[in-house]
């Protein structure tokens, strides 16, 4: 069982690293976390959109509003180059 984390230091620690953001509506976005504001809105760079686990397209720079996020996780380097793992 994992320990709960304070979200602001967690997100600040992910800044500049590859992340996967899943929205409440099922879409997933993989990119580099550029910044997070006080409301936890997120800016991603080099973003790819995945729908049902399949690459849908390359979007580039994306801003995600905080209330749409289901979860965010760091992406390991192997995942960044290869296929997405669940």
UniProtKB/Swiss-Prot annotation:
An example Gene Ontology CC term for this record: small nuclear ribonucleoprotein complex
Sm domain span: 6-78
SUPFAM superfamilies associated with the record: Sm-like ribonucleoproteins (SSF50182)
Residues annotated with N-acetylserine modification: 2
GO molecular function: RNA binding
Family annotation (Pfam families): LSM
Alphabetized InterPro entries for the sequence: Lsm6/sSmF (IPR016487), LSM_dom_sf (IPR010920), Sm (IPR047575), Sm_dom_euk/arc (IPR001163), Sm_F (IPR034100)
UniProt keyword terms in alphabetical order: Acetylation, Cytoplasm, mRNA processing, mRNA splicing, Nucleus, Ribonucleoprotein, RNA-binding, Spliceosome
Assembly with partners or alone: Core component of the spliceosomal U1, U2, U4 and U5 small nuclear ribonucleoproteins (snRNPs), the building blocks of the spliceosome. Most spliceosomal snRNPs contain a common set of Sm proteins, SNRPB, SNRPD1, SNRPD2, SNRPD3, SNRPE, SNRPF and SNRPG that assemble in a heptameric protein ring on the Sm site of the small nuclear RNA to form the core snRNP. Component of the U1 snRNP. The U1 snRNP is composed of the U1 snRNA and the 7 core Sm proteins SNRPB, SNRPD1, SNRPD2, SNRPD3, SNRPE, SNRPF and SNRPG, and at least three U1 snRNP-specific proteins SNRNP70/U1-70K, SNRPA/U1-A and SNRPC/U1-C.
Biological role: Plays a role in pre-mRNA splicing as a core component of the spliceosomal U1, U2, U4 and U5 small nuclear ribonucleoproteins (snRNPs), the building blocks of the spliceosome. Component of both the pre-catalytic spliceosome B complex and activated spliceosome C complexes. As a component of the minor spliceosome, involved in the splicing of U12-type introns in pre-mRNAs. As part of the U7 snRNP it is involved in histone 3'-end processing.
Official protein name in the record: Small nuclear ribonucleoprotein F
Native source species: Homo sapiens
């Amino acid at each position: 069982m994992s320990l709960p984390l304070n979200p602001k230091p967690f997100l600040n620690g992910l800044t500049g690293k590859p992340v996967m953001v899943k929205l409440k509506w099922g879409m997933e976005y993989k990119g580099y976390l550029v910044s997070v504001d006080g409301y936890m809105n997120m800016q991603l760079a080099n973003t790819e959109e995945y729908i049902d686990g399949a690459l849908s397209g390359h979007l580039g720079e994306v801003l995600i509003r905080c209330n749409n996020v289901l979860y965010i996780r760091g992406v390991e380097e192997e995942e960044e180059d290869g296929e997405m793992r669940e």
